[in-house]
């Protein structure tokens, strides 16, 4: 009996072991599948998954839905998907950031990771690929930016002498602008102020960059400045040129637009290159720089010489024209757009215009013109400027960014080399921060004592933040203050009653008011402006 049991036991044990192994293996596979499904569901529910977003259509993705007013489309999607979501433009995945928290976490807390630019075709066209604004983030780019920023400040806001020179340029162009506007409004006429405003602002930047100005009827200068809107449409968020490259393969409006874009960039670059070459030829060794172009050339030549004390942080000489192109091109377009907004808001809100004028009359008086030293004593004027920037959000979406590494924003995973759109408009129109954000109300920036609420003013997002923050922000705010203060002090602005009071816009990199007509009249006479300009050194016109 014992022998029999001993003989059968190995077979039984072997059979049992095989069955157990099979069952265990099957159970393990089922458990692994079940666990995998559970983990997948948990992963999808976790905040570190990819950002959500709308369904993308084949070939075009969500491009057809973006439309011209991309910032409004993004704001609508943010209400549905949250402040971080993903769309697809053609085959290009794009993460869109909305709201102060998401944008700050990305651009400020992770500035270097979000500082790159996408490899878009249009970006490579600007300044032959050497653009500071559109160039890739690198050590070379950081050197280029530091040099551009320090030189721009040296010729604008850093020193009392440079601030005085800039005020002089602004005063001279404000005087010329007033004369042109008033003359063209003679006999009660109305005019579109767009062209005179663009020329006035461009002349200030021409004086800073090149040491010269142009007449308001200079055909070559007007032609050069006439393509600002076309440029903005091509490089703005949602532009089809970059995200649907197959459209370049056959005749269509997008390809036509891109070829025009290439030509206008060549024209603009050649304009600046001519100024650069003339400056190099006429630059006197050892002499003080006459303007910003001189300063860049001197810095680059000092670096290239390799002599003791050379400026190793300066620009390379071949980068100088592209950097000046960026500074001159971006500043004159941004400033003219902002100033047009200030004028149209003056005419649409005459009570605001009257309050600005009353504060200027009380603080400055009628026997002199406003100047930068008056700024701290003009809180309502500054409130008007900040509210105009917030309300218009004339730079609604920044130039597209790209990531340099894998990262997370608000828990969502964003891979390296992802294209990122930053919706600044969403910050400026957040009802949680700005009660009734669609109302234009400069008083929202004043505290109970009538002073500027600096914390609120600093939260207006118009010049971006982080590594790509606009280097001309300080200069822009200074010039806008000078222009609008002098204009309001000297003139009255009246809307055309035959036009609709509703404002309409054109969209691109900036939001520009469409053509509008106003009447401009002197509050008194040109005497103050004429006398002030006579004290300035006469500037030699460009040849």
Swiss-Prot record:
Query: GO biological process: any one?
Result: endothelial cell-cell adhesion
Q: How is its activity regulated?
A: Enzyme activity is increased by cytochrome b5. Enzyme activity is increased by liposomes containing anionic phospholipids, phosphatidic acid and cardiolipin. Inhibited by naringenin with an IC(50) of 5 uM.
Q: In which tissues is it expressed?
A: Constitutively expressed in retinal and kidney pericytes cells. Expressed in retinal endothelial cells (at protein level). Expressed in cardiac, pulmonary and aortic endothelial cells. Constitutively expressed in trabecular meshwork of the eye (at protein level).
Q: Which domain of life is it from?
A: Eukaryota
Family assignment? Belongs to the cytochrome P450 family.
Residues annotated as binding heme: 470
The organism's lineage? Eukaryota, Metazoa, Chordata, Craniata, Vertebrata
Q: Which GO terms describe its cellular component?
A: endoplasmic reticulum membrane; mitochondrion
Q: How does it sit in the membrane?
A: Peripheral membrane protein
Q: EC? A: 1.14.14.1, 4.2.1.152
PROSITE patterns in the cross-refs: CYTOCHROME_P450 (PS00086)
Pathway assigned to this chain's UniProt record: Steroid hormone biosynthesis; Cofactor metabolism; retinol metabolism; Lipid metabolism; arachidonate metabolism
Q: What happens when the gene is disrupted?
A: Severe ocular drainage structure abnormalities, significant elevated intraocular pressure.
Q: Which cofactor does it need?
A: heme
Reactions catalysed, as given in the entry: an organic molecule + reduced [NADPH--hemoprotein reductase] + O2 = an alcohol + oxidized [NADPH--hemoprotein reductase] + H2O + H(+); 17beta-estradiol + reduced [NADPH--hemoprotein reductase] + O2 = 2-hydroxy-17beta-estradiol + oxidized [NADPH--hemoprotein reductase] + H2O + H(+); 17beta-estradiol + reduced [NADPH--hemoprotein reductase] + O2 = 4-hydroxy-17beta-estradiol + oxidized [NADPH--hemoprotein reductase] + H2O + H(+); estrone + reduced [NADPH--hemoprotein reductase] + O2 = 2-hydroxyestrone + oxidized [NADPH--hemoprotein reductase] + H2O + H(+)
Q: Which InterPro entries match?
A: Cyt_P450, Cyt_P450_CS, Cyt_P450_E_grp-I, Cyt_P450_sf
UniProt keyword annotation of Hydrolase present:
no
Keywords (alphabetical) are: Endoplasmic reticulum, Fatty acid metabolism, Heme, Iron, Lipid metabolism, Lyase, Membrane, Metal-binding, Microsome, Mitochondrion, Monooxygenase, Oxidoreductase, Steroid metabolism
| Reported induction | Up-regulated by polycyclic aromatic hydrocarbons (PAH) and 2,3,7,8-tetrachlorodibenzo-p-dioxin (TCDD).
UniProt subcellular location = Endoplasmic reticulum membrane; Microsome membrane; Mitochondrion
What are the protein's GO molecular function terms?
estrogen 16-alpha-hydroxylase activity; estrogen 2-hydroxylase activity; heme binding; hydroperoxy icosatetraenoate dehydratase activity; iron ion binding; monooxygenase activity; oxidoreductase activity, acting on paired donors, with incorporation or reduction of molecular oxygen, reduced flavin or flavoprotein as one donor, and incorporation of one atom of oxygen; testosterone 6-beta-hydroxylase activity
Q: Which PANTHER family match?
A: CYTOCHROME P450 1B1 (PTHR24289:SF16), STEROID 17-ALPHA-HYDROXYLASE/17,20 LYASE (PTHR24289)
Protein name according to UniProt: Cytochrome P450 1B1
């Amino acid at each position: 009996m014992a022998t029999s049991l001993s003989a059968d036991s190995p077979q039984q044990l072997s059979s049992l072991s095989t069955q157990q192994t099979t069952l265990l293996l099957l159970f393990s596979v089922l458990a692994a599948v079940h666990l995998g499904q559970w983990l997948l569901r948990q992963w999808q529910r976790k905040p570190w998954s990819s950002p959500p977003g709308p369904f993308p259509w084949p070939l075009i993705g969500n491009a057809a839905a973006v439309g011209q007013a991309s910032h409004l489309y993004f704001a609508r999607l943010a209400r549905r998907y949250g402040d971080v979501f993903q769309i697809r433009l053609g085959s290009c995945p794009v993460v869109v950031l909305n709201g102060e928290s998401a944008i700050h976490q990305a651009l400020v807390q992770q500035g270097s990771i979000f500082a790159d630019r996408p490899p878009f075709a249009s970006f490579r066209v600007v300044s032959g690929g050497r653009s500071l604004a559109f160039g890739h983030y690198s050590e070379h780019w950081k050197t280029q930016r530091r040099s551009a920023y320090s030189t721009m400040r040296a010729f604008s806001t850093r020193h009392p002498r440079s601030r005085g020179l800039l005020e002089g340029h602004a005063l001279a162009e404000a005087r010329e602008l007033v004369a042109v506007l008033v003359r063209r409004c003679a006999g009660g006429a109305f005019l579109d102020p767009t062209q005179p405003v663009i020329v006035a602002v461009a002349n200030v930047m021409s004086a800073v960059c090149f040491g010269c100005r142009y007449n308001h009827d200079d055909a070559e200068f007007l032609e050069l400045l006439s393509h600002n809107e076309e440029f903005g449409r091509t490089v703005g968020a949602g532009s089809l040129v970059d995200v649907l490259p197959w459209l370049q393969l056959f005749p269509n409006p997008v390809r036509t637009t891109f070829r025009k874009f290439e030509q206008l960039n060549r024209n603009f670059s050649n304009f600046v290159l001519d100024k650069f070459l003339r400056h190099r030829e006429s630059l006197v060794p050892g002499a003080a720089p006459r303007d910003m172009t001189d300063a860049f050339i001197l810095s680059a030549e000092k670096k290239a010489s390799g002599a003791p004390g050379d400026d190793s942080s300066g620009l390379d000489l071949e980068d100088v024209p592209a950097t000046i192109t960026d500074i001159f091109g971006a500043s004159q377009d941004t400033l003219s757009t902002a100033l047009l907004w200030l004028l149209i808001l003056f005419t649409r809100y005459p009570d605001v215009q009257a309050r600005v004028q009353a504060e200027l009359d009380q603080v400055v008086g009628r026997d002199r013109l406003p100047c930068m030293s008056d700024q701290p004593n003009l809180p309502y004027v500054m409130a008007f400027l900040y509210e105009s920037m917030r309300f218009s959000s004339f730079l609604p979406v920044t130039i597209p960014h790209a990531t340099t590494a894998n990262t997370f924003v608000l828990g969502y995973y964003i891979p390296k080399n992802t294209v990122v759109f930053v919706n600044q408009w969403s910050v400026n129109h957040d009802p949680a921060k700005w009660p009734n954000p669609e109302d234009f109300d400069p008083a929202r920036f004043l505290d109970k004592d009538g002073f500027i609420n600096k914390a609120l003013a600093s939260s207006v997002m118009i010049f971006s933040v982080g590594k790509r923050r606009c280097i001309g922000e300080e200069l822009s705010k200074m010039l806008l203050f000078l222009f609008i203060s002098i204009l309001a002090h000297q003139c009255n602005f009246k809307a055309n009653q035959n036009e609709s009071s509703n404002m309409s816009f054109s969209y691109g990199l900036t939001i520009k008011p469409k053509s509008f007509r106003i009447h401009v009249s002197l509050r008194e006479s040109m005497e103050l402006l004429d006398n002030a300009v006579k004290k300035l050194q006469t500037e030699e016109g460009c040849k």
